[in-house]
Every structure is written in structure tokens, then in C-alpha cells.
Amino acid sequence: MSRKPLIAGNWKMNLNHFEAIALVQKIAFALPDKYYDKVDVTVLPPFTDLRSVQTLVDGDKLRLSYGAQDLSQHDSGAYTGDISGAFLAKLGCTFVVVGHSERRTYHNEDDALVAAKAATALKHELTPIICIGEHLEVREAGNHVIHCEEQLRGSLAGLSAEQIGKVVIAYEPVWAIGTGRVASASDAQEVCAAIRKELASLASAQIADSVRVLYGGSVNAKNVGELIAQDDIDGGLVGGASLDGEQFATLAAIAAGGPLP
């Protein structure tokens, strides 16, 4: 099955709503509409930027989509500081990240919570980008594939085969995030292939073949082409490079097979 590449820009805790508008405008200007037939492009701003991004995307009829970096497993109630999936859906979000390594590390989120958040996202017709990945000591011990398979199973626990078919998986080796280090294309492919095999055992081969698996970890315009040329890598969860409108647009164009005539 041919899977359309997805380039997702995770802005993390960067850019106020004015800066968000400027960045989306830069991306829109630098990436002509014809590329969107070949690649899906989404930005993942902080919550406080979402309404501004929505207004710009809707008003200018831009073809890029947008989403959020997290959501609550609860729909509403006395959960101070949490953000409901219903709120995100009302703002027109398409995607939501769950289980990013920074959430797992700094907020002690475990696989069970990630699975609950993924289920909540799906309930609100949001596409969860479920993140998994190993720390350096796990890779150096040679246990990275087993670790990622176990984390995947835990993060999908309770989801039906049909629901699994609606998620995106992002493999993000923790040791490569924001460090400038990047897994080699063959190293990334090894884990992404194992992820797809595990998806087949959890759902079906047909569903596994349809799910997009992204690589995240110091993705930039220089390495994205080699990464997505791998059989089981369908795009990138992009961090720092997504804050540079020109580089992000270039990266997306490469993922589309560009430059296009």
C-alpha cells in the first residue's frame, strides 16, 4: 500500500500567537499548493496559538493542517490545567501528539496513560501521533527493538484493530531529540519495520500496512530524504527545524519528492 508522507512540526513550548501567525504564513508562502497532493503537512503549536492558527488557515484556505501537543484523557471536569479533546476538535485540530518522550520524562506519563489519551483522541475524531522510543542506554545494550515493541503494545492497549488503523506512530529515539544526533537511516528503518510487524500482530497485516510510521529526532532538510526513502518510514515528527519556515517548507518539499515542476 502506498502511504502518503506526513511531515509534522512540533513547536514544543515556543512562539506566542503573533509569532505563530508569522511562521504559518512563511510556510504557506514557501510551499506551493501542488506539494500538498504529495505530502501531508501539519503544525503542532502550543495551545495558546491554536485559535490564531485556525483563523489564518481557515481565512486563507491553506492546505496545511494543525494539531496539538497533548490532551487530557478526560473530557471535562475538575482537572485544572488540562485540555479536553473536545476543545481541540472544536478548534479544528486534525492531529494530537500523545506520549512524547518529554511528557513521559518530565510528567511521568506511562504507557497506560498514553493509551487512554489515544483512545480519547480517537473518540473526538482526532488522529493521535503516538510516540515511542528508547533512551541511549537501552540502545547501547542492544534492547532497543524489544523496548519499542513493548512500549508500542502498552501505548495501544485497549484499542481495537479498527482504532489502531486510525493512529500515527512516531519513533523518536530519546537520545536523538534536540541533540543534533540522528539515528542512521538503517537504524531508524530497523525499528520502524519492527513497529509495523508488531502492528500486524496487534491488528492485521492490512492495517499495519496502512498506518503511517514517522521518525522523530533531529530531522532536518539534510537528512529527511534518506530517512523517508526507507520502506517503513513515512515522514517525520520535526522539532527544531519546524521553527524555521523556509527549512520546514524545504523539508516538506523533499518529502513530497520535490522540487516539483
Swiss-Prot record:
Question: One cellular component GO annotation, for this chain's record?
Answer: cytosol
Per the UniProt record, which EC number(s) apply here? 5.3.1.1
Give the domain of life: Bacteria
- Matching InterPro entries: Aldolase_TIM, TIM_sf, TrioseP_Isoase_bac/euk, Triosephosphate_isomerase, Triosephosphate_isomerase_AS
Alphabetically ordered keywords of this record: Cytoplasm, Gluconeogenesis, Glycolysis, Isomerase
Please give a single GO biological process term from the UniProt record.
Answer: glycerol catabolic process
Pfam families in alphabetical order:
TIM (PF00121)
User: Its catalytic activity?
Assistant: D-glyceraldehyde 3-phosphate = dihydroxyacetone phosphate
Quaternary structure, per UniProt, is:
Homodimer.
Q: Which PANTHER family match?
A: TRIOSEPHOSPHATE ISOMERASE (PTHR21139:SF42)
Physiological role: Involved in the gluconeogenesis. Catalyzes stereospecifically the conversion of dihydroxyacetone phosphate (DHAP) to D-glyceraldehyde-3-phosphate (G3P).
Q: Which HAMAP family match?
A: TIM_B
This chain's protein is named Triosephosphate isomerase
